[in-house]
């Protein structure tokens, strides 16, 4: 039986304040959450959308140590960047706060203390890695090593970013401290644990029986965790940055970030509504929906519900529509590798194009499987869909009305069967979009909204009012009235998806925003209503703009390759006498040309001090022939001649291969006589 609620509380995963927000965050969490919140508000429902920065945890302390500043300096900087970016991008939080706030510290401490006083924790001592040089325990990302699953040598103690596997520090092969680089030792330490196994029977019924409607990826991951059997999970860590564990004997220990962060949803609500926050968290007529990425499923479906159940007075989430991951140009997005499209940079590089990114991220939303963002697809969806379909229809409807009816909505006359079918087709859009949004299928909902523009384009193309204008203006009036009703419907249907563009469209239509209940109506614009000035809703994105973005990524990839470069192992030793057999000389390049039908080969004429010799070298992809004429190069002079592409090569030019595969010809520092020996 379908449940009915008085209000909806939307929570969004708290981004770590150790860097800006990127497109993976947007596609997985914030764009779908904002679409849902805007949709419910359009329906006139009571909604709260809660967000905030996660400002505790090891990634933040590591960045602070790397930059030589305090963790507070780090979170102050990035909280400001993140909050400003969200505002400019149109993410409509009712509050966007932070976990370093006084309200949150008190709320998290009180929550822990309530569970502690009720005897809901297990206190036990265990062995954990300890850095003797830095004199501290190594939690999570304070320890690095080789991933046992994929062999990545830079896996963290909580996760391997290369393969995405969740890890424990003891899983790592050849672990090292991320602080000192030293090999850690095992040392005993005391912590508090939440016994998840105690709540396993409840979770099995609540999820596996009562919430079979959850997305398959969410339901399936929860089932896997439950089938493996839940174990007690530590709620504290040996760190000096975070919320201190509020009990005696817990000096030097803070609340583990996974325990601390979700309480941020509660504390942020309390910060916004100090007198009525409990209505949103404890009234069973409130529906709570968590928007998260797949890496947070276990925390929001297993751990946080166990915490709430242990406390005893809170609602549990009604749905957790987690998304999979968005990749970038075929590679996993990574903050540490700077492999991302950062929102704050996008807003500078692409001014006024918030809706283009919202549209593309929704069209490529990783709702059921990992998906990929490419700049070429971004350009294609803008030019071929937003410009050519939606923008084209809106522009034609408004421009033709201005041309034939002085910008006033004309009176519709007698309808044809085709008119009636068109009206029926767009009247059905409301039910379709609504059904998809209610079930968190945002990608398909946006596609259905775009179908409305396709209906409009087809209608105008089939009716050809520009031809009828010469003979039948009453018929043109009917056609344009219907086209304008479709346009006004588009302003409603797309508002959750493209809010900036729909604000612009409402100005062009000269109307106030209409409610969701009016979607599908055929009388949104009255006859005689004066329209505003027609403008282009979207603009074409040129190749040069996309090429600049692709180049940024290529530069990042090159920087990563350089940072991760490892020289090849030294080959086995040879005898000194064997080396002395090589006759390495310096020669001057007299001529250099490309070898026909050979992409990699250059043919050299070289003065070796005794005669002129020919050498063929495979460096054509690294140098233009004219760049080498007149230069001096080192070459092996006594290599046996051999034929390459029919040319006898009398030696080998020496070059060094860089980390990126580029070759650099070896030359003497100062000019020497041709034929000089290299010793």
UniProtKB/Swiss-Prot annotation:
Query: Has the keyword Nucleotide-binding been applied to this entry?
Result: yes
* Amino acids binding Zn(2+): 147, 150, 160, 163
Q: Keywords in alphabetical order, please.
A: Aminoacyl-tRNA synthetase, ATP-binding, Cytoplasm, Ligase, Metal-binding, Nucleotide-binding, Protein biosynthesis, RNA-binding, tRNA-binding, Zinc
Secretion signal span:
none
List the CDD domains hit by this protein, alphabetically: Anticodon_Ia_Met, MetRS_core, tRNA_bind_EcMetRS_like
Limits of the tRNA-binding domain: 578-679
Q: Per the Swiss-Prot or TrEMBL record, what residue ranges does the short sequence motif 'HIGH' region cover? A: 15-25
Entry's InterPro entries? aa-tRNA-synth_I_CS, Anticodon_Met, Met-tRNA-synth_bsu_C, Met-tRNA_ligase_1, Met-tRNA_synth, Methionyl/Leucyl_tRNA_Synth, MetRS_core, MetRS_Zn
Return the motif ranges for 'KMSKS' region. Answer: 332-336
Where do the TM regions start and end?
none
Known cofactor(s): Zn(2+)
Output a single Gene Ontology CC term carried by this record.
cytosol
Chain sites annotated for binding ATP: 335
Biological process (GO) annotations held by this record are: methionyl-tRNA aminoacylation
Q: How is the cofactor bound?
A: Binds 1 zinc ion per subunit.
What Enzyme Commission number does this protein have?
Answer: 6.1.1.10
Which reaction does this chain catalyze?
A: tRNA(Met) + L-methionine + ATP = L-methionyl-tRNA(Met) + AMP + diphosphate
What GO molecular function terms would the record report?
Answer: ATP binding; metal ion binding; methionine-tRNA ligase activity; tRNA binding
Q: Where is this chain's protein located in or outside the cell?
A: Cytoplasm
Q: What does this protein's UniProt record list under function?
A: Is required not only for elongation of protein synthesis but also for the initiation of all mRNA translation through initiator tRNA(fMet) aminoacylation.
Family to which the UniProt record says this protein belongs: Belongs to the class-I aminoacyl-tRNA synthetase family. MetG type 1 subfamily.
Share what the entry says about its subunit structure, partners included.
Homodimer.
Name of the protein described by the UniProt record? Methionine--tRNA ligase
Q: Which organism is it from?
A: Parabacteroides distasonis (strain ATCC 8503 / DSM 20701 / CIP 104284 / JCM 5825 / NCTC 11152)
